[in-house]
Regions:
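Short runs within selected transmembrane alpha-helices of multi-pass transporters and secretion channels
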Residues: 1, 5-17, 30-47, 80, ...
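Helix-loop interface residues and adjacent transmembrane-helix termini in multi-pass membrane transporters
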Residues: 24, 98-101, 211-212, 239
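Membrane-proximal transmembrane or re-entrant/amphipathic helices at the cytosolic face
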Residues: 271-273, 295-332
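Interfacial/gating helices of multi-pass transporter permease domains
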Residues: 27-28, 65-77, 93-115, 143, ...
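Interhelical loop/hinge segments that connect adjacent transmembrane helices in multipass membrane
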Residues: 27, 45-88, 127, 131, ...
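Hydrophobic alpha-helical transmembrane segments in multi-pass integral membrane proteins
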Residues: 80-84, 164, 230-234, 287-303
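Hydrophobic/aromatic end-of-helix segments at the C-terminal termini of transmembrane alpha-helices
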Residues: 87-95, 99, 128-129, 169-174
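Specific pore-lining/lateral-gate transmembrane helices of multi-pass inner-membrane transport
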Residues: 106-223
Length: 332
């Protein structure tokens, strides 16, 4: 129920933003709508928790070993969470030092888009924790792998549509949203999210890391990603501004969160990542490639920027992508 409420909240935010774009609401009305939606979600969660008695406090003696285990796990988890978002807080400062306010504005718009997409990608996180925990206790490793493939396909289907759609129609969306001058923010945003075609499909693998208390490997990969990002950003930002910053983040994410995490998953955790990519990503190549070509054709066919034309393009691209995905991915 809580995950469903969170997903509804995220959808509501997107709908509110779209309505604001169409009817030209002022910023105060938009902020009030966001606050109202967030408050409603908090109230619904609180009522659900009280009604179902999800928490019960018992004061019992806890062993030192358990304390140590909790502290270590919580520590690595905190490092992972902080490092994950630290990049996006440091990079604007580098942009201000090496480039200027114009590039910060571009990056801020791109970061807003990345935030929305990241929020959607995490809608299912934690939902399978009870199931994966039980399968691990029962020693059913093969079923965990099967669940990872099934959830990975769904995540790639859903997030693939969003990321591919943003690549095709992002410039038009940004143009209509914030104006022609900030349209380059679309390409900046694309580099921030494109590695999500891989990382967003690792939800079950990350959940398994939590279950077996090996989240430190995820934290280490994020630290490596952060170091690579900041090092390369210092060299790229003076020449390419916000685009250079996004390319630096792309490189850090690709090496740290994709390549290195795949090594951890395959060698240390024991997941067959090659088989995973064959069953998830390889099957999605045809739907994505055909949709990409079709989307480019539609953009050339309907060149004028308008809310109406953007909605038409989104619908056409979505129909083609969903139809092909059902044929080649979801029904197999």
């Amino acid at each position: 129920f809580i995950k469903i409420v969170e997903l509804i909240n995220k959808l509501t935010i997107i709908i509110i933003t779209t309505i604001a774009l169409v009817f030209n609401f002022d910023v105060y009305g938009l902020i009030f709508a966001y606050i109202a939606a967030g408050t409603l979600v908090i109230v619904l969660k609180f009522i659900y928790i009280l009604k179902n008695k999800l928490f019960e406090f018992k004061f019992v003696r806890v062993s030192r070993k358990m304390y140590k285990s909790i502290i270590i796990f919580s520590g690595w988890n905190m490092v992972a969470l902080l490092t994950q978002r630290l990049t996006y807080n440091i990079v604007p400062s580098l942009l201000g030092f090496f480039s200027g306010t114009a590039e910060i504005a571009l990056f801020t718009i791109a970061l807003s888009i990345e935030g929305y997409i990241w929020t959607f990608s995490n809608a299912l996180n934690g939902l399978f924790l009870p199931k994966i925990t039980k399968l691990n206790i029962d020693g059913k490793t093969e079923e965990i792998n099967q669940t990872m493939v099934a959830v990975g396909r769904f995540q790639l289907f859903f997030m693939g549509l969003i990321i591919l759609g943003f690549y095709l129609l992002g410039p038009e969306f940004v143009n209509l949203w914030v104006g022609e001058d900030l349209e380059p923010a679309a390409l900046v945003g694309f580099f921030l999210v494109v590695t999500g075609l891989f990382t967003y499909t690792y939800g079950i693998a990350y959940t398994y890391l939590l279950v077996v208390k090996k989240v430190k490997y995820y934290a280490l990969s994020l630290i490596i990603s952060l170091v690579i990002t900041l090092t390369s950003a210092v060299f790229l930002i003076p020449h390419y501004g916000a685009l250079g910053a996004s390319i630096a983040i792309f490189g850090g994410n690709l090496i740290g969160q994709v390549i290195i995490m795949n090594i951890f998953y395959h060698k240390i955790i024991g997941f067959n990542m090659i088989d995973f990519y064959k069953k998830v990503h390889l099957r999605s190549v045809i739907p994505m490639a055909v949709t990409l070509v079709f989307g480019i054709y539609i953009k050339q066919l309907i060149e004028e920027y308008s809310i109406k034309n953007l909605i038409i393009k989104i619908m056409l691209v979505s129909i083609v992508y969903v139809a092909l995905s059902f044929i080649f991915v979801l029904t197999k």
